[in-house]
Curated annotation (Swiss-Prot):
The keyword Protease does not apply. Involved in the transposition of the insertion sequence IS2. This is Transposase InsD for insertion element IS2A. It holds the Pfam family rve. InterPro entries: HTH-like_dom (IPR025948), Integrase_cat-core (IPR001584), RNaseH-like_sf (IPR012337), RNaseH_sf (IPR036397), Transpos_IS3 (IPR048020). Residues 106-289 form the Integrase catalytic domain. GO terms for biological process: DNA integration; DNA recombination; transposition. The keyword Nucleus does not apply. Gene3D superfamilies: Ribonuclease H-like superfamily/Ribonuclease H. Keywords: DNA recombination, DNA-binding, Transposable element, Transposition. It comes from Escherichia coli (strain K12).
Amino acid sequence: MDSARALIARGWGVSLVSRCLRVSRAQLHVILRRTDDWMDGRRSRHTDDTDVLLRIHHVIGELPTYGYRRVWALLRRQAELDGMPAINAKRVYRIMRQNALLLERKPAVPPSKRAHTGRVAVKESNQRWCSDGFEFCCDNGERLRVTFALDCCDREALHWAVTTGGFNSETVQDVMLGAVERRFGNDLPSSPVEWLTDNGSCYRANETRQFARMLGLEPKNTAVRSPESNGIAESFVKTIKRDYISIMPKPDGLTAAKNLAEAFEHYNEWHPHSALGYRSPREYLRQRACNGLSDNRCLEI
């Protein structure tokens, strides 16, 4: 704009300058009519971020692995409970960046040569459940193995079991039964629910598959060497290890199991999930039930 003003001052026409420099002719006319003592009255709005910063510190003090999006989701939820205006996610990002509170960027992961074109998530609850297992080590060297079941729509951890033994059919059957009781009480599903798992022996055992069909579940196995086909369960393992197991006290197996129960409860009640509009699984379910909406419409709110 300064170059345009200089050219016009030398005698060049306003239309020619605006066309050649691709600047607004109307804006040039406004600038040329300004007096010498003109001052820009616009000022950037000053915001006091002290209170927001304190709340951010409170969140990351308890959950140090949370990035700015999940911090924003928890602040938004608290603001809704208090009847206050929600905080913008960009403001949370700016404050955390200015105070060096952002997480380090993840290293770039080379894309897989094996494309996965299927979709694990479903549009309604109780259409497909997925299951998997993981293990972790306590400070005293004791190893715990966890088996769990998730809903592939609302991401709620339906049931889980922990043991010092291996992954076996009996544990999987306990998780199946607990998941059905969680969603249907003493009844069985009116239509079969897909039970998506990998090809572990505890899932492919005849006893497991027969028990699943007795409960109204339809066993489905992923393709061989295709962990992406059970991506929701794989992502949950990464989440539970990063956000909970890595920071919780686990001096021995008993203490770790008690803290793991609190971790699963916190995940269901508080953990913001990007696929749910950064709502927790149970928060999403309550919102859907309160509004009487389907899963698709609920995600749009």
